Structure formats: C-alpha cells, structure tokens
Amino acid sequence: MDSTVPSALELPQRLALNPRESPRSPEEEEPHLLSSLAAVQTLANVIRPCYGPHGRQKFLVTMKGETVCTGCATAILRALELEHPAAWLLREAAQTQAENSGDGTAFVVLLTEALLEQAEQLLKFGLPRPQLREAYATATAEVLATLPSLAIQSLGPLEDPSWALHSVMNTHTLPPMNHLTKLVAHACWAIKELDGSFKPERVGVCTLHGGTLEDSCLLQGLAISGKLCGQMAAVLSGARVALFACPFGPAHPNAPATACLSSPADLAQFSKGSDQLLEKQVGQLAAAGINVAVVLGEVDEETLTLADKYGIVVIQARSRMEIIYLSEVLDTPLLPRLLPPQRPGKCQRVYRQELGDGLAVVFEWECTGTPALTVVLRGATTQGLRSAEQAVYHSIDAYFQPCQDPRLIPGAGATEMALAKMLSDKGSRLEGPNGPAFLAFARALKYLPKTLAENAGLAVSDVVAEMSGVHQGGNLLMGVGAEGIINVAQEGVWDTLIVKAQGFRAVAEVVLQLVTVDEIVVAKKSPTHQQIWNPDSKKTKKRPPPVEKKKILGMNN
C-alpha cells in the first residue's frame, strides 16, 4: 500500500530533507514509529488470504491438537496465541464485531492495518500524533455520516431474505452455498414474529454424518444429535421436559472418599441407601410429571432402569450448545442436580427421526406457528460439517441485524470505493492536518477492494483503476467479482448498513488508541538473588553484591 501521490504535508518535508542524509538501503529498514504496527501487520497477514468470497482456507491446528480446515477469520483469531498487547486489542475488537453482528471480522483487522500504515506515513512527514488522532476521528465521523446515503436497498418484512444473506454465506466458500442460504433464509423468515422481532436462539442447527451438504434440510421443531438411552424411545403426546447439566445417576460416582464398613450388614445398608436415594430422585421427577430428561453428563445403568420403570425418556446430549438451545426454546432452567424443575419445558412430541444414516431427536410442537425450526446439516466429514455449521450460525446472526435496521448497502468493495472517492474529494480541498488525513483514510479504504481482487486472482491494478473510473463517473454500484468488476445490484451482493457502521466504529476505536502509543512497558517481578552452592559447606550463600558502583548523570548511585 505504497502512496504514490504526495499529500500537502509531504512536499515541504521532502524539500527540507538534509542533502547529507542518504536514503537507506532495503537491508537497513527504518524502525516503525508506531510500535504496534508490526504486530498488527503480522495478524493481518494471517487473515488477508481468507478475506472475501474467493478467499483461501487454512489448516488450523488447535491447542488440543485438532486439525481444522477453515477460512473463517473468527475461528482463526480465536485459536491464535498472541503476546503483543496491540494484537490482543485488535483481536478483541474483531471478535466483538463477530459476536454482535456475525460478520465483518476480517474487515476490522484489514482496515485497522491499512489505517495504521497510512498513519505512520503521516507521522514520518511530521504530523504530530494529537493532530493525527483528531484528524482520523474527523474522517471517521465523516464516513459514518455518509454511510446511510449509500443505503439504496431495504429488506421488506415479507421479502425473501436469501439475497441479503448471500454475502455472509459466500465468505465461507462452501460448494452448495445457494442451497444452504435458502435453508437458513427460510428458517429465519418462518421464525420471525409478526411485530418484526427475531430471536436467533429459535433456529437450531443439528449436524449428522452421512450424505452430502445438498442433503441438508429443515425440520419442524428443535432437533439435536443426542442419544436415546433406555427402552423408552418417544413421547407422542404431552411431553414435559427437564434439563440436567449433570450425570443421570449418583452425584459423585467416583468420589475419592472411602466408606468405613465394618461388616457385611454395613455394606448392604450402604448399597441400599444409595439405591433408595436414586429411586427417590427419579420418583420425584415422575411425580412432577416429567416424562423426558435431557442430560449432559454420563448415564448410569441402574438409574436408567429406574427411568424406564417410571416411563421417563432419557436423552444424552452431545454438546452443551444443544442443551442450551433447548433451555432457551423450552423456557426451562438447566439444573445442576436431579431435582424436578419448577417450570418444566413443554412440547407436543419427542421422538427419533432417521435421516439417511444419521439419527436425530426431535422436539416438536403441534401449533402451526412452531417456536423453533432446525437446519439439519448432512456431510461426510467432520471438517465439512463444522465449516457448514459456522456458516449457518453466522448467517443467523447476520439476519438478526436487518431485523433491527433493514437498510442495505452495496457489497463486494463498492461501499469502500464510494467512501474513498468521497474522502478524496473532500481531502483535496481541506487545509491543515484534515486534508492529508482524509486522503490517507481514502487510500486505506481502497485497500479492501484491492484485497478482494487479489484473492480472486485478478489483475489488481487494472481492476482498481477500472473501479475508480466508474465510481468517478457516478456509478457507485460497481464492485469486485470473480472475473472482474460487477454490478452488485444485479448480482444481489449487499452488506447490512448496521454491521458496516459497527465495523467502522470498532476500527476507529482501535486505531485512535494505537496511534498515541509510543512504546510498550511490561511489568515484571523483580529478579530474586541467585544462590551459590558451596560443596564444602552445608549452607547456601547468597551471591555478594558487586563492589563497583555505576555513575548515572555524574552522581554515585
């Protein structure tokens, strides 16, 4: 991202260079004026190849030793071990963006890097840090004020949201992208309330091995890939559900305590007391009307026999996320012990559903406006299912944003190029520090379409030049596609206004903080005195202090 056009502040600095100073050779690289720039560049270099619909994937080896093939910036950032505080700060901002909106993680990282690189150039040309910070804040405010004027499309309350989710799903580079997008869009649209509100937790995701992603489907109700235990396999009417985050059996089956038993009678009494306690707990569940128990821990065989006796279906959940979804949809608490809940979950039926080679447990409601739908994902490999699951969750979170603000802006880098044109026009007319800062901000924004073109394998300079010419002519709908520039309105590539605005705010917060940091001070514990072991003595002796004293500023210390 080298700057080719000197700004208003660059010319006096270049003319005032000392002729005795020769330029440095490439081997003698100048130190960064921004101490955080190198760390941010390193982090951005990891994320850059994954940006956009044509981004590449990476083999990610987690701390547990698992190898994951993913192009999701959020997953990559989460797995990285970072030490630099600037990298920590940037990752936190990017992850917050992903958690709040489901999109824009790579956008935050790459734009932060571009703005910091431009900021260092301005610092080299003599712009003071306080003025740089103030000018960047002014440019950010100008961007946020201009952004709503680019919203030329809106998602209607009865409109199919598939095209609005296309941009989010496209970043995961899944082969049956259109099929999954339509499934998620239909599920979100069906769950949406009449008043326009949308609860993401009412759309479940269930992964089953076998088949292909094209075999994925929607199921009425909430489906989990849990395991049915015992002889009771279904409740066909009036299911009352209890959820337990504990083993279905003794509270501590492997307790380290040792029972003091002095006779066979004591042993019989001890076993009888344990059995009576378990039967009492299961009997209390049955007395409260509980006929379905979902547990997160292990299932004890003796307790399972008691559950069959009382007609209770026992389901062993495979993940914490599944049981949390059940808790939110059924509106019943997740209990730490085998006690009847004060408010059991209610649904019409609980049964096992066979889908190809996989089995799912379905919680179904009889009413037409079912409170939950499940996207059932099929696949041959764990990695493929995991990538598809991430894409679906991100799309569900992304759909939540248009429900708050339905305005959409052009995607595929068109918005960034339009904002760069606006800042360039204003920056060329402004005097003082705002002019060069606006121009620097514009150059940083153009870096995002450049990255899209680079990841698509296009001639970057030609594509950016063509885009700039079209935008200068007033056509703000031209973005980067697979074979060149495209009309985003015709291709249906849109970004959500609220998500893009949140991304700009996150970037501004990080950049405005890092441009004022000049060095990193690490607090460490004072070193302990080393000890010398004397083999001739049984005692250890401390190393004697040095005899000579240093002088600092001409004074003995």
UniProtKB/Swiss-Prot annotation:
Compartments, as annotated in UniProt: Cytoplasm
Could you provide one GO biological process annotation from this protein's UniProt record? protein folding
The record's Gene Ontology cellular component field reads:
chaperonin-containing T-complex
This protein's superkingdom?
Answer: Eukaryota
State the UniProt keywords alphabetically. Answer: ATP-binding, Chaperone, Cytoplasm, Nucleotide-binding
Q: Where is this region: Disordered?
A: 1-33, 528-557
Hey, which family's this protein in?
Answer: Belongs to the TCP-1 chaperonin family.
UniProt-recorded name of the protein: Putative T-complex protein 1 subunit theta-like 1
Q: What gene does this protein come from?
A: CCT8L1P
